[in-house]
């Protein structure tokens, strides 16, 4: 009798263990929905009575890889804690980036402090032609084809914020057309509109396949 109880308890324990692991995996998947890039980590020394007190700062870029991105800054006594704070701040500052297919909608120049970054749309297959700091922002935002060039300071923090400034200036072709009182066809190149249509059709097909798989 006692042996039967032990087996039953063991099975229940195994089920509970599997449920716990499944729940943990679900939480990990939710946490891993975003792309994270640590751009810079610096050690900061503060002079206090009796010596110096050290802490760390982290600059992190977070995005969903589908048009949303944010930048955060964190400070703590340990590097992991500084990164965690930066990630949370980045998520609070998410903004949407207008995209046409896998590239940006139009050329733009962003500036922040001494940083100046120029972005230009690129044809499919070009890839992200950019330095490390700008690349981190563009990849997290979901830009796959773009030409980027730093025209100012090479400081990673300045480049990141200049890239963000450039992305925040981007507009949808419809917005530009409405402001100028023209049609979208008069504003946007035919290739851009064609790429957008193909991207929309591909996304719609993917949603239908996913829905069919669920059913």
From Swiss-Prot:
One short Pfam family name for this protein?
A: Ribosomal_S5_C
HAMAP family, A to Z: Ribosomal_uS5_B
Lineage top rank: taxon: Bacteria
Which regions are flagged for Gly residues bias? Answer: 1-12
* UniProt KW Transferase keyword: no
Q: Provide the domain comment.
A: The N-terminal domain interacts with the head of the 30S subunit; the C-terminal domain interacts with the body and contacts protein S4. The interaction surface between S4 and S5 is involved in control of translational fidelity.
Q: Which GO terms describe its biological process?
A: translation
Q: Where is the composition biased (Basic and acidic residues)?
A: 13-31
Q: Does the keyword Cytoplasm apply?
A: no
What GO molecular function annotations does the UniProt record carry, in alphabetical order? Answer: rRNA binding; structural constituent of ribosome
**For the S5 DRBM domain, which residue ranges apply?**
34-97
What is this protein identified as?
A: Small ribosomal subunit protein uS5
This protein's assembly is summarised as:
Part of the 30S ribosomal subunit. Contacts proteins S4 and S8.
Q: Which UniProt keywords apply?
A: Ribonucleoprotein, Ribosomal protein, RNA-binding, rRNA-binding
Spell out the family assignment given in the record's similarity comment.
Belongs to the universal ribosomal protein uS5 family.
Q: Where is this region: Disordered?
A: 1-31
- This protein's GO CC annotations: small ribosomal subunit
PANTHER family, from UniProt? MITOCHONDRIAL RIBOSOMAL PROTEIN S5
Checking NCBIfam families in the record gives:
rpsE_bact (TIGR01021)
